[in-house]
Each structure stands twice: as C-alpha cells, then as structure tokens.
Design a protein with these regions (language model features):
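N-terminal small/polar loop signature for handling phosphorylated ligands or for N-terminal nucleophile
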Residues: 92-155, 254-309
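Short acidic, glycine/serine/threonine-rich loops at helix termini
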Residues: 102-107, 132-136, 154-160, 181, ...
C-alpha cells in the first residue's frame, strides 16, 4: 500500500491544468482538510475489470469521474481500432437515472467520436437491455452503459459490450483491460468530441425494441380476456419507467397501477434504503399500493431495468416476495409448457441457468425433454453461449438466482422489460386456470420437487478481510468436508481447478467452463452448497439449496419449515454465523 507521502504526491498531480476546476477544488480540499477521504480517493486506481468500472463518484484515482471513465473509454477505443481500424466503426451508449450518468454518457460519446467512431447516444435514460438491442440493431462494434445497478446513490459504473450485444468476454475482456492500463495519463484521452459523429436515438429505437419484446408473448388471446387484471409496477426511481408500462400496454394490459413517489427518475432513490428489487423495503410502497387497489401482482425493476422482483399473493391473500429462483422457475415452466401445448418445439431448443441457480430448472427442462446448460454467474456467459449455438440451437429462456431473466435471444443481456411483460402474461394464464402465480409455483413443486434456496454473505473488509476470504476458500479446497449436517459429500465441483470429483465412483471429469473461484459440494441428501468470493464487494457468498418431495400444496407450509430447518442446521454445522 502507498505511504501517505506517496498518496499526497499522487493527489497533487491532479492539481494540474489538464484537470477541470471542480476537480482541482475537490482535491485541494482533501489535501487541506480531509486526510481520510484523500487516502480513500487515491490509495489505489479504480480497476477496470472484466465487467468494466464501478465505484464511488468524486475526484481521485479510486473514484468514478470523467478522468477514470475517460481512461477506460480511451483504452476501449484503442482496442477497437486495433481490432477493426476506426473507419466505419459504430458504438452505442446508454445510461441510467443516477447522478452524473448523463454527464458520463456524454463524455464517453465525445471520446468515442474523437477517435473517429460513429456514436449512437440515447437521448435520455434507458434500460440496459435496450443498449444491447441497439448494438445489435445498428450493427455496432461495441457499446457502453453507464450504471451501477442497485448500488447506493454515491456509486456509478461503466459496463462495456461487444458486437453481439453481450458484455465483453474472453479474449476481449483481458485484452481491453491491457489497453486501459496503458493509458497512464489523462493527456492521452481524446476528450474533444466531434459532434458530427454523434447521433441521438430514442423513440424509434424504443419502438423497434418493444416490437421484439412483443414477439415473446405466447398467449395474447388469454391477455385479451384478462386485460383489466390490476398490476402494480414500480421502477424504483429508475429507467424502467421509460419502457415497462409501454411493454405491458403493448401486450394488452389495461390496468397498470403506478407508484407515483417512485415513478420519477431520481439518482438519490429517496423512498428506499436500497433500489434493489431483492429487498422487501424496495417494494414496500408498491405492496401498499397493491393492497389499496386490490391488485393481483406487484412488479419492481432495479435502476437500469435489467432485474425483476415480483410480489404475489399467498394462499391467505397476503403479498409475499418471490426470490430470483422462484421467478425463474415460474417463467421457465410457463415458456416450456406453452411451447409444448402450442406444438412450437422443433427439437433444438434449450435454456440456460447459472451454476448457483436452483437445479429445479434442470428438473423442469428434463420434464419437457428440453436441453439445459449451466454457466458461471453473469449474463455475459449467457450471451457467449447463445452466440456459440446461434446457427444450430434455439435459446428460449434462462435466468439466474440474482433476479435476472432473459426470455428470448433478441438481446444478449438480462431484460426486466420483457420479463415484466412475460410475468404478467403468466399471471393471466394462471388466472385462466383458476390459479394465482403462487398456486402455480406450488403445483410445480408438487410435480418436480420442492427446492428451497438461501444465500448468506459473510463480509470481510480491507486487506485483512481479503486474506481471510482467500484462507476460507483454500481451506474448503484443500481440506473439503467429508460430511455436512450428517450427510455425506458425494461430489465436489472445483471451477478454479476445472475438475468435478465423483467421490462415490472415485472419478474425475473436466469442467468445460473458464476458470472461476467457485466450489460446490453435493450431498447424499440432495443438498447443493456453492461457495464463491464476490467479484465486486469484500464478501464471500454461500448458496444453499435443499429439496424434498411435496405431496400436495396443502403441505407446503410444514414442508417449507422442514427445509428451512435443514438449511439452518447446515449453516450451524459449517459454523458460518
């Protein structure tokens, strides 16, 4: 780590004329008055990783600002020029509702245009999946979205995409990182944009995108019968407001109820602790509105509208939140069952899930004789696989436990706009059968097995914390448990070593995925435990999945208690809490 003298010298280099007055003023104040803030802003460089940039906004090398963003964009530009020259290169840019997102998007556009690229810049905030669509529609070589997903208000970020509309993957990701690291001075950034190279896009692109979304509808005639089903939707101050209500209307829904306090885009997210549809607090106002209006479904999207949270009525009429696994299960079952009912199968269809997502999706796919693939966490791996099989197989849906879902191949990133529309359609289909979405979920459990998942995060901050996380992973890897909660470990998947060990057979097979620091333990009782360090935060994640038979939906509550107790016993046995 840098000494305080080195940090001060690094900060003083930001007082030069190449930095704007606002930046110089902020740095001077830190140098004069706030040593702690100064150290945090300059002790390291904000790293351009495989997912791009994400950090707290402000002056400094460890902050999101036009200079760190500029270095990333110039490095990406240099890589694009290496790959295909700068003649005829097109790029697309979108941004979310966050503070400075528009400013950062315009700065990115200026740098791309100064490098000779034709730039398609959305006129205002838009959902991330529409950026993926724009890259594909305009035949762009690359694209960028300015967003920090559901991080706190002080954060912003920068995600880079490639010409298929997916986030960059190997070999491009590491090669772009190499180019970004070569930009060692802000003087190497071409800030002076060429306005002739920047084209504003908006409503026409929205319509083209929504037309593709509409194609995923399977039962439009059922929606006509139940068009007035009351649905509450909240964008949680984010970009979803620009397209989700329009998508629902395009599908035929006529009774979409908003949450006025949250319909206004606001990077401060004033009505919630966190704009994360996984959090009950984020849906509190929407559920209140649903109770008042006797709505049947509540939907929420995160700030860049690529993740979806649902709340449905349970058997006593109380709204409960579905987790990402449950939403994926309902949507995949609906797609597969309706493909079968309408005789749409051609025999080459497949679905995708991540390795930490519920294996109930595999059971459902097997039940419909549909192929499934497991990929590492992150939708960039979905995009990579879809591209790989583009000419021979048909992707029809896929999801991950972290609330991302993509119901078609028209874009190559998770899409909460289309997922909201599909969830609403699924609710009308269930209603046509005399069921709620919750009752449909219970029916799925009865038929395929009751799977219950839980995620716990253990936070370990700073260098000491990072060392502890490494030691924990090394401990599980080098001395794996033989039993967990009195159930034998029968298989271990080590994605870092790319090896699957079948303990019962004593055989090893290769895991054909890129290396990733993930371990999985499969137990004799059907339990799956996945362990991985977070790629973006100082924590280690433990994913637990247990399952059992559900004899009938009336036994749901008592069976759920049994599964909850099993998860608690596993956590106790592993001494995690």
């Amino acid at each position: 780590m840098l000494s305080l003298t080195e940090i001060r010298a690094k900060a003083q280099s930001w007082l030069g004329k190449e930095y704007n007055e606002e930046t110089r003023k902020e740095v001077r104040e830190m140098l004069d008055k706030d040593e702690k803030k100064l150290v945090d802003a300059f002790y390291q460089d904000l790293e351009f990783g495989t997912g791009g940039l994400r950090g707290i906004m402000g002056a400094g090398t460890n902050r999101m600002n036009i200079y760190t963003l500029g270095m990333a964009t110039q490095g990406l530009s240099n890589y694009i020029i290496q790959q295909c020259g700068n003649s005829g290169v097109k790029v697309a840019i979108a941004h979310d509702c966050r503070n400075n997102s528009r400013y950062f998007a315009e700065t990115t556009a200026n740098i791309f245009s100064a490098n000779g690229f034709e730039v398609y810049l959305f006129e205002s905030l838009r959902p991330t999946p529409e950026l993926s669509f724009a890259i594909r529609h305009f035949k762009c070589q690359s694209g960028v979205v300015i967003t920090a997903s559901h991080n706190p208000p002080e954060y912003n970020g920068y995600k880079a995409y490639w010409n298929d509309g997916g986030q960059v993957v190997a070999p491009h990701d590491e090669e772009i990182i190499t180019e970004v690291r070569k930009i060692t001075s802000v003087n190497k950034i071409k800030f002076n944009g060429n306005k002739d190279n920047i084209k504003s896009i908006g409503k026409e692109t929205d319509e083209l995108f929504l037309n593709e979304v509409k194609k995923i509808s399977i039962n439009p005639e059922i929606i006509k019968k139940f068009a007035s089903i009351p649905i509450v939707y909240t964008p949680i101050h984010g970009t979803g407001i620009t397209l989700v209500p329009a998508a629902l209307k395009m599908f035929g829904f006529k009774n979409i109820i908003g949450v006025p306090e949250q319909d206004i885009p606001d990077g401060n997210f004033p009505t919630v602790k966190s704009p994360n549809p996984e959090e009950p607090d984020a849906l509190k106002l929407a559920i209140k509105k649903a109770v008042e209006s006797n709505a049947e479904l509540v939907m929420a999207t995160d700030p860049d509208a690529d993740r979806l949270g649902l709340a449905v009525k349970n058997r006593t009429g109380e709204f409960i939140l579905l987790n990402g696994n449950q939403t994926a299960v309902i949507l995949i079952w609906y797609i597969l069952s309706q493909f079968k009912e309408r005789k749409k199968y051609k025999g080459n269809e497949y679905i995708i899930k991540t390795i930490v997502t519920t294996d109930l999706l595999e059971k459902i796919a097997d039940g419909f004789n549909v192929e499934y693939f497991n990929v590492l966490t992150g939708f960039k791996f979905f995009a990579e696989l879809i591209r790989q099989y583009e000419d021979v197989k048909k992707y029809i849906g896929g999801g991950e436990e972290s609330y991302g879902f993509l119901p078609g191949d028209y874009v190559r990133d998770k899409d909460a706009v289309a997922s909201c529309a599909l969830a609403a359609e699924t609710a009308t289909w269930a209603k046509s059968k005399g069921m709620s979405l919750f009752e449909l979920l219970l029916d799925i459990y009865v038929k395929y097995g009751f799977y219950k998942e839980k995620l716990i995060n253990i936070v370990r901050k700073g260098k000491e914390g990072a060392d502890q996380i490494k030691a924990m992973m090394a401990g599980y890897r080098n001395n794996p448990p033989e039993k967990i909660n009195n159930s034998k470990v029968i298989k271990i998947n080590d994605y870092e070593m790319q090896v699957s060990l079948d303990i019962l057979k004593g055989t090893k097979t290769r895991i054909d995925l890129v290396k990733s620091d993930v371990l999985q333990f499969f137990l004799a009782d059907g339990t799956k435990i996945s362990i991985r360090p977070s790629g973006t935060e100082p924590k280690i994640k433990f994913y637990f999945s247990v399952n059992t038979k559900l004899d009938c939906s009336d036994k749901f509550e008592e069976t759920e208690k049994v599964l909850d107790q099993r998860i608690s016993a596993i956590i106790d046995d592993m001494k995690l809490l």
